[in-house]
Curated annotation (Swiss-Prot):
This is Molybdopterin-guanine dinucleotide biosynthesis adapter protein. Keywords: GTP-binding, Molybdenum cofactor biosynthesis, Nucleotide-binding. GO terms for molecular function: GTP binding. The gene is mobB. GTP-binding protein that is not required for the biosynthesis of Mo-molybdopterin guanine dinucleotide (Mo-MGD) cofactor, and not necessary for the formation of active molybdoenzymes using this form of molybdenum cofactor. May act as an adapter protein to achieve the efficient biosynthesis and utilization of MGD. Displays a weak intrinsic GTPase activity.
């Protein structure tokens, strides 16, 4: 139990960006990440995909190593590196978050994983045909493009600085509560 407490105290904070498909999660992140970086917050992202994904290309050396049976392949050059891992079963969000380098990351934004028990900002747009999803105990704020009466912070989905302010304040509170 002590290890768990120590780990929890040293964990990089995770903040989910959730909502239905088409709610603008990726678009919001594309605009939000540079805004947070300008505030000297080092951001990393975990994105969940429901589709089978292939990072490398068929026939390339890294693909051939994977096809030969390697459980992990690191592809590296002078600018970046990526590790590709074959997983026989789904991995947890906690496991994925532990893969980040703490010296490069202050905050992990998580796109998807909406059922995970992590703090999150829920996105919804007025033009969506689906109603506002359930606001569970982990939803810190709701970002919309329409007025809404809720018992959480309401953010304007089109005002990136406002959302960044909210995240920056939450992040300071997270570090202060540790």
């Amino acid at each position: 139990m002590i290890f768990k407490v120590i780990f929890m105290n040293n964990q990089i904070p995770l903040l989910g960006i959730t909502g239905y498909s088409g709610s603008g999660k990726t678009t919001l992140l594309e605009k939000l990440i540079p805004e947070l970086i300008a505030r000297h917050i080092r951001v990393s992202v975990i994105k969940h995909s429901h589709h089978n994904m292939q990072v490398d290309k068929e026939g390339k050396d890294s693909w051939r190593m994977k096809e030969a049976g390697s459980s992990q392949v690191i592809l590296a050059n002078d600018e970046r590196w990526a590790i590709m891992t074959e997983t026989p079963k789904p991995v947890s969000l906690d496991y994925l978050a532990q893969q980040f380098d703490r010296t490069l990351t202050d905050l992990v934004l998580v796109e998807g994983f909406k059922q995970e028990p992590i703090p999150k900002i829920l996105l919804h747009r007025q033009e969506m045909t689906k109603p506002l999803p359930e606001i569970d105990e982990y939803v810190l704020a709701v970002a919309t493009n329409y007025p809404l009466e809720i018992d959480r912070t309401l953010l304007d989905i089109n005002r990136i600085p406002q959302i960044a302010d909210f995240i920056e304040n939450w992040l300071h509170h997270f570090h202060g509560a540790r």
